[in-house]
Amino acid sequence: MGSLPEQFVFRSRLPDIAIPDHLPLHDYVFERLADRRDRACLIDGATGETLSFGDVDALSRRVAAGLSSIGVCHGSTVMLLLPNSVEFAVAFLASSRLGAVTTTANPLHTPPEIAKQVAASGATVVVTEPAFVAKVSGLAGVTVVATGGGAERCASFAGLAAADGSALPEVAIDVANDAVALPYSSGTTGLPKGVMLSHRGLVTSVAQLVDGENPNLHLREDDVVLCVLPMFHVYSLHSILLCGMRAGAAIVVMKRFDTVKMLQLVERHGVTIAPLVPPIVVEMAKSDALDRHDLSSIRMVISGAAPMGKELQDIVHAKLPNAVLGQGYGMTEAGPVLSMCMAFAKEPTPVKSGACGTVVRNAELKIVDPDTGLSLPRNQPGEICIRGKQIMKGYLNNPEATEKTIDKDGWLHTGDIGFVDDDDEIFIVDRLKELIKYKGFQVAPAELEAMLIAHAAVADAAVVPMKDDSCGEIPVAFVVARDGSGITDDEIKQYVAKQVVFYKRLHKIFFVDAIPKAPSGKILRKDLRAKLAAGIPAC
């Protein structure tokens, strides 16, 4: 990507702040430990067990010492294959203390999906629950650590936590260059890639939201934050766990989403901050249990990962009249938050329906013409680009993909089409990127297409999103069957379902004579999406 004149660059309405980006992530999170050592930090939603900030600090030191004893050191990679849990948070902070990198994975992924990420990330330790040990037990060169009651032929998380926390090795962390987190993302296109988020990057991104005299996301020490979104997703890891801990709030950790149990936890613990995604809001709004619980404690509902329509916003306002509702906008590669609703600021300002906030502090944003690369003025849609210390270092072992995403002037190209209005609010209107968003989860068409084409009965295939009221988008496939194969749509669905996690499964198959392609061979997805919009019948 070349260098072009930058005529139109947008910044936050809020002034830049001093960010202690010289600190490693764990030191930044615990920087104010002396003032909140005895305050509640993590609350286990299932048991009610509460760990104070002092408890979490000490436990993360002990687990770090335990990880060190099994070979984890500066530059090692640890995979967390866990549902939401206190152990997840502690293991992440423990790895940070050692200068190790944490890669997170959905425990519902299939063994082949997990094996690919272990190999690609170079993970040598996997921390998981006994229920998921079988998914990783056959991986060569990997030490498996089991939480809970432990498991045969595995190290025990409890054993790690019994180590001497004062015996930690001295580690020289390069905050600008050492990655601390390695989530996997499909970026704007293609197969999942490891996103290298540095200590400095995550410290900057958290500070952009919750630090300063007038934080954009005003979390208080007396707040109780609901953590129902999966921590293996960067939205939850960053905006709930790290932002919550930095602000000194208590975090109620819910292992998995269940509407009734979630409402019970909100009432029981007086939850004040509810970060959600639209599919959860839909389920909550539909639930008969909603009116049986006192949810008046909620003062803020933060929506992310997928757009929230006006109709859904109206439902939230009706059901939770005390809550301020707003949206943020993020992308894993952006560190992850690009913009946040100003209604969440300590000194809030009015926001428009459909907006996803204003650009975060200490960062620059521009809108560029996808064809010319020139920056555009207000109210003109183009590709959203972001620049700042918070963005990723790059994709692990993939300089080509990195160069396609971050240009030589440091601008990260999101693949999202949007505009900035006269009040600095950002609106997303379309996507250049090919990703399918199923309930906020990323589904890369290329991954499913490679699977389909590998089937002996499939000559060609293309995967595109279809709009869905409850899921946002669902993956559907256009398939060219080989002559005489006689393959059915159910056979194709089952073939894919055996290899992928639930949200990547194909929902519909459309048999066609040919896949529309450009002379370059690129699939013309717009043509296929147009067929869906026109109501093509399922085959």
Swiss-Prot record:
<dbReference type="GO" id="GO:0050563">
    <property type="term" value="F:trans-feruloyl-CoA synthase activity"/>
</dbReference>
<keyword id="KW-0547">Nucleotide-binding</keyword>
<feature type="binding site">
    <location>
        <position position="327"/>
    </location>
    <ligand>
        <name>ATP</name>
    </ligand>
</feature>
<feature type="binding site">
    <location>
        <position position="327"/>
    </location>
    <ligand>
        <name>(E)-4-coumaroyl-AMP</name>
    </ligand>
</feature>
<keyword id="KW-0460">Magnesium</keyword>
<feature type="binding site">
    <location>
        <position position="235"/>
    </location>
    <ligand>
        <name>(E)-4-coumaroyl-AMP</name>
    </ligand>
</feature>
<feature type="binding site">
    <location>
        <position position="332"/>
    </location>
    <ligand>
        <name>ATP</name>
    </ligand>
</feature>
<dbReference type="GO" id="GO:0005524">
    <property type="term" value="F:ATP binding"/>
</dbReference>
<feature type="binding site">
    <location>
        <position position="439"/>
    </location>
    <ligand>
        <name>CoA</name>
    </ligand>
</feature>
<feature type="binding site">
    <location>
        <position position="522"/>
    </location>
    <ligand>
        <name>ATP</name>
    </ligand>
</feature>
<feature type="binding site">
    <location>
        <position position="416"/>
    </location>
    <ligand>
        <name>ATP</name>
    </ligand>
</feature>
<dbReference type="GO" id="GO:0009698">
    <property type="term" value="P:phenylpropanoid metabolic process"/>
</dbReference>
<feature type="binding site">
    <location>
        <position position="440"/>
    </location>
    <ligand>
        <name>CoA</name>
    </ligand>
</feature>
<feature type="binding site">
    <location>
        <position position="187"/>
    </location>
    <ligand>
        <name>ATP</name>
    </ligand>
</feature>
<feature type="region of interest" description="SBD1">
    <location>
        <begin position="258"/>
        <end position="327"/>
    </location>
</feature>
<dbReference type="InterPro" id="IPR000873">
    <property type="entry name" value="AMP-dep_synth/lig_dom"/>
</dbReference>
<dbReference type="Pfam" id="PF00501">
    <property type="entry name" value="AMP-binding"/>
</dbReference>
<feature type="binding site">
    <location>
        <position position="188"/>
    </location>
    <ligand>
        <name>ATP</name>
    </ligand>
</feature>
<feature type="binding site">
    <location>
        <position position="186"/>
    </location>
    <ligand>
        <name>ATP</name>
    </ligand>
</feature>
<feature type="binding site">
    <location>
        <position position="433"/>
    </location>
    <ligand>
        <name>(E)-4-coumaroyl-AMP</name>
    </ligand>
</feature>
<feature type="binding site">
    <location>
        <position position="305"/>
    </location>
    <ligand>
        <name>(E)-4-coumaroyl-AMP</name>
    </ligand>
</feature>
<keyword id="KW-0436">Ligase</keyword>
<feature type="binding site">
    <location>
        <position position="340"/>
    </location>
    <ligand>
        <name>(E)-4-coumaroyl-AMP</name>
    </ligand>
</feature>
<feature type="binding site">
    <location>
        <position position="193"/>
    </location>
    <ligand>
        <name>ATP</name>
    </ligand>
</feature>
<dbReference type="Pfam" id="PF13193">
    <property type="entry name" value="AMP-binding_C"/>
</dbReference>
<comment type="pathway">
    <text>Phytoalexin biosynthesis; 3,4',5-trihydroxystilbene biosynthesis; 3,4',5-trihydroxystilbene from trans-4-coumarate: step 1/2.</text>
</comment>
<dbReference type="InterPro" id="IPR042099">
    <property type="entry name" value="ANL_N_sf"/>
</dbReference>
<feature type="binding site">
    <location>
        <position position="431"/>
    </location>
    <ligand>
        <name>ATP</name>
    </ligand>
</feature>
<dbReference type="GO" id="GO:0106290">
    <property type="term" value="F:trans-cinnamate-CoA ligase activity"/>
</dbReference>
<keyword id="KW-0067">ATP-binding</keyword>
<feature type="binding site">
    <location>
        <position position="239"/>
    </location>
    <ligand>
        <name>(E)-4-coumaroyl-AMP</name>
    </ligand>
</feature>
<keyword id="KW-0587">Phenylpropanoid metabolism</keyword>
<dbReference type="InterPro" id="IPR020845">
    <property type="entry name" value="AMP-binding_CS"/>
</dbReference>
<comment type="function">
    <text>Involved in the phenylpropanoid metabolism by mediating the activation of a number of hydroxycinnamates for the biosynthesis of monolignols and other phenolic secondary metabolites. Catalyzes the formation of CoA esters of cinnamate, 4-coumarate, caffeate and ferulate. Is also able to convert sinapate to its corresponding CoA ester, a reaction that is rarely observed in 4CL catalysis. Is more efficient with substrates in the following order: ferulate &gt; 4-coumarate &gt; sinapate &gt; caffeate &gt; cinnamate.</text>
</comment>
<feature type="region of interest" description="SBD2">
    <location>
        <begin position="328"/>
        <end position="395"/>
    </location>
</feature>
<feature type="binding site">
    <location>
        <position position="328"/>
    </location>
    <ligand>
        <name>(E)-4-coumaroyl-AMP</name>
    </ligand>
</feature>
<dbReference type="GO" id="GO:0016405">
    <property type="term" value="F:CoA-ligase activity"/>
</dbReference>
<feature type="binding site">
    <location>
        <position position="328"/>
    </location>
    <ligand>
        <name>ATP</name>
    </ligand>
</feature>
<feature type="binding site">
    <location>
        <position position="189"/>
    </location>
    <ligand>
        <name>ATP</name>
    </ligand>
</feature>
<dbReference type="InterPro" id="IPR025110">
    <property type="entry name" value="AMP-bd_C"/>
</dbReference>
<dbReference type="GO" id="GO:0106286">
    <property type="term" value="F:(E)-caffeate-CoA ligase activity"/>
</dbReference>
<feature type="binding site">
    <location>
        <position position="332"/>
    </location>
    <ligand>
        <name>(E)-4-coumaroyl-AMP</name>
    </ligand>
</feature>
